[in-house]
Every structure is written in C-alpha cells, then in structure tokens.
Amino acid sequence: MGFRSHVLEPHRPFRLFLFFLLVVFLIDSYPLSGLAALSGDASYLNDLIDRAAVAHLSEKREWHVLLHYRPTLTGGVSSMQDDPGFFLALEGKTDPQAELAATLTGFFSEELIGRSKQPAQCAFVARYYWLNEQLRFDANRLPPQPCKRFTQWFDEFNAEAISMIFPSGFMNNPSSMFGHTFLRVDGKDQTPQTRILAYTINYAAQLPTDAGVEYAVKGIFGAYPGYFSTIPYYLKVQEYRDIDNRDIWEYRLNLTDLQVRRLLMHTWELGNAYFDYFFFGENCAYHILSLVEAAEPSIHLLDRFPVYTIPVDTIRALRESGLVGEVVSRPSRSTLVRRKRASMTAGERAWFDRLIRNPTDLLAEGFRALPPDQQAFVLETASDYLLQHSAVGGEEGDPFRIKNRAILSARSELKVASREVPIEPYVKQPDLGHGTSRIDVGSGWRNNRAFEGIHVRAAYHDLLDPEPGYTPDAQIEVMSIAFRHYHHQSQARVERFSPINIVSLAPMDSLSHVPSWKVNLGMQTVRYNGCALCANGVANVGAGAAAETQLFKREVYFAFAEAEANYSRAYEERHRVGGGGTVGMLADVTDRWKLMLSGSYLRYALGDKSDDFRWFVGSRYTLSQNWALRVEYNHRDHDNDVVFSVQAFF
C-alpha cells in the first residue's frame, strides 16, 4: 500500500491529529515494533498478549532464564543483560510482562532490530520457540520468518552434544589464575580425535590492546563489556595448551537433543548483546553456566553463585546436578614433554638435553648408534619441546622453529612407529579437589596467652592445602580473615586480614627457567615497642627461584628477595620500609601429610629503622577431600604464636 500526494481538506487536520495520538500510544507501548504491527493481525496480537497474561507466562522460570532476570533487594527483578538492544520494551530490563508483550508485538514485524539487524523472530529464536510452545501460534495469522542466517549457523554445528571445557589456572595471567570455562559443540560426524576441529562458545571481556594492570582494576568493577563468540577449538587449544602450557579438561554434558538445541538458540540470541564483565562475579564461568540453564531451566545453577563465581565451582555444580558424563584430559605441551622425558633412560635423556640445544648433534656417532626406536622417541620429544617454545610467535620463537625443522627432518628418515607413553596431567581432575572456600576452627597460645580462633577464607588455595585438583606449588588466597578471642581480659579482635596473598613457586630444571614470585597485601597484629597486639598494615612483594628434589616423596626448596612496607602506630613515624629475603622448603612427606619450613630476614631502612627475623613451621594432615588438620608455629622477635586447627573446605 502506497501514499499519494494530495491537498488536505479542511476537516482532515483533526483526523491526522487523532491518527498521530494513536501512533504515539502504540510507540509508547511497543517502541520497536508497534508501528509494524499495524500492518499485521492486531486482534490476534491482542489475543496472544491476553492469553500470555492469563497464563502468567512473564512469571515463568523459562522466561526469566531467557531474559537473565535476577531478584532484586526491593522484591522485583532486573536483568543482568546490559545492552539496551536486547530488550524490545523500554522498561524490559526490569519489567518481564512489558518485555513479553513487546516481544509478541515484535514477532508480527519484519523490522530489523539489534546489532545483528534481523526480524525479532530471528534475533530472538529461543524466545519465539518457547512462546510458540506455550501459546501455539497460528501460522496463518502469525507467519513464521525463515531465519536463514540462524538456520545456516545452527546447521554448520551439526550438533550432537555439548562439552564444558576447563583450562587449568595460569599463574602468570591475573585473568586466568582461577582457570577458565567455555563450551565446545561436538558434531555428529566428529570422533574424539577430530573434535579439535569443533567450534566453541566463549564469553570474555572486550579489552583494549593496552589494558595491562588497568584490566585488574576495571575488571573488578565491570568497566568492560563482555561478549559471546564462536571460535574453532583448535585455536583455543593452541592458546591454552601450547602457549600458556595449561592442562585442559573436557566434560561431556548429559544433554538431550532438545536441550542442545535450546542452548544453541539462546547462544544465537546473546550474539545480539553484551553483559558488563565482572572479574569475580559475572565472569566467563557465570555466563557460560547461564547457557546451560537455558538448555534446562529447571536446574537452578546460577543460584549457587550470588556473590562470586570460581570456574571450577561451576564444574562441581554441573556434576552435582547430574549433568557431567565422560571426562577427558588434554595435557599441556609442557606436561607432554615432562612425562616423556621422565620415561626415558638416562642415555636417552642425555641426548634429548643435547639435541634441544644443538640439533647438529644429530650427526654424532653416539646418537646414530642408538636403536631406531630410541632415536625416534628422543627426536619426537625434542620436537614437542621446541614446538612448546616456538608457540610464543614472532622473532622470539624463530630459533626454536629453525631447530625443530632439523629435528623433524631427521625423524622423517626413521621408518619406525612412535613409542606409546601414557600422558596424565600432573594436576588431578579439578572438580575432585577440595572446596574453594575454607573455614578453620582452632585454639592456641600467643606469648603464653591462650585463645580460640576462627579463620574464614573466601578463596582459593594455599601452599599447605591438599593439592589434588590444584596447580602444584601455587597459592592464591582471596579475602582471608582471622578472628581470635583471648582469655586474658576476654579480648576479641581481628588477628589477620588479607584481601590477596599469592605465591607462585616454579621449580627450575633443564626444561624450565621460570622465576618464582609472590605478593601479599593485608593486615596482621604485631608485638612491638610495648604494644602487644597492634594492627600492622603489610605490603610485600618478592621474586626468586625454586628447585625440586625427590629424596623422600617430593620436596620444593625456594628463596626470595623481597621488599616490604609496614604501617602501624607501633612504629616511629608510623611506618617502616625495607627489604630482605626468605628461604624455605615445602615437602610432601606422604600423600596426606605436608610440611612447610621457612625463615626470613628483613632490614627496614626507612621510617622505623629495625631488623625483623621470622620463622615459620606448618604441617597439614588430610582427613578427607574437604577436611584437614593443621598446626602452625610463627616466630618474630619477642613474639611466638602456636595454633592447632580443624579445617573444613566448602
């Protein structure tokens, strides 16, 4: 229907004014598609809106999951979705009924909406699918759109199943210390060997190229938008396994064909919008889990994470909900090399160490005298090592790539099969480790003053905690606070508080020369200058080295050079700044018993000029996956502290 130009008759301005009021009313009710609905079946639209209201569809769990509504403190709801283009009603972020009515109205329109510029039926296919299930749309009165772009996208997956992928933590990247999760779409025509060609569904913050330390701050407060994307799995494997040297765990989810379809439909919808990315709360693990909820809304997964979300905890939530099936590990390139080297004879290991430094030793008579199968195994392991170090890219990786070409050329001349070596990650299955939060209840003495204490840690793991499921020799403690009640004068106080305490011990050997490091920010009480329990602010950083032996079971020796600043009313000028060092040992005595010894000396040259000698002895005995016993002794000048505690992880 077209418009033709003509001269207005005297009575027509009034009609035009009434028409204008009607248009304004419709736009106010359904801002994006009300006009388009005029050309459709308005009576049928009203009927659908009425039926949806009678059935209370806007209150249904499924609708709230699709719109990402969460309860507010005032008794209402608000969507976690932060892109206005995700909503068809102006008040859709906080009004489920208005958004449902606007969505139904949008389905009658062919207007292109959202960042993807599609009709509402195609931009929000999961909403259309669910509302059609509830209201049984009459295709003659509400014709379905073909949605060719979605159909092509969906068909390319040829989806059979969904796997949750968990790359283990990476200590040298703040955004990856706790691990990461994303989904892999397993195709019907893929085998376990070819699933590396599958596509993944990933959620991540969109960062500027020069984010640096800025990311750690802005990421905490949601200053970056987070987007969903689909990326080939082999690129993610290259990033995590080959470059970052992180073991990858693959959890096949027990989802039906219908649940897989729902998950992919909602993923398509989220390509239209963004969420504000919060490092501790609404992070990758949280929003990836929301896709699983969309697949099966009856399972309340996100309710378990009201404040913060740690990736491995979402894996545990899936397991406890019965959604985890087969579990497969994909060891890192570093793990592959270390396991192969450990299986070598002393002679093979010596040739491996020579070849990775100087491939021309391939021509040495000693190497040529080895049996062909041994030569092949040494060459393959050397190639794995060189590939690991060439993965960094650019000029830094060029020398390793040149060496690897010589190694591969020599291997191609040997017509023997590869030696089969079982490769298991050094880290046990992450979801089978202890809980990420911990509470300690104990008692002890400080300078002959008895006390009872309780210690609560929000996350994550320290050097003495049971190691299965966690990165060996790594400590990440977040929001740790200890309270004590001293019998003397019945005094209760905060003994220690630490928002962040990180230690990364990286044992050096012929394969790795990564430095160890640590950082600690917090408060602890000190006995100094006549003040028995003065609050003392601490900022400590250190860098050093570690080495590993196996004299008994396993021992790690470490040494740090460090700098420290203190602030307390106990000090002259209320502060002191200095430096020094720490040496120590961390030992696995048995599978259940761990021991730690350390000694420190610091000289404070600024502020309150003083020396500080410290000793620490700690021991932990594991009772079960989530229970342990611990004893600790801390000594500083004129200050001795002993505590016995029972630890519960959750």
Name each model-derived stretch:
Residues 158-243, 456, 485-493, 589, ...:
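Glycine-rich catalytic cores of cysteine/serine-nucleophile enzymes that process amide/ester linkages
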Residues 76-158:
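Low-complexity, highly charged intrinsically disordered N-terminal segments
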Residues 437-441, 477-479, 513-521, 555-563, ...:
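Transmembrane beta-strands of outer-membrane beta-barrel proteins
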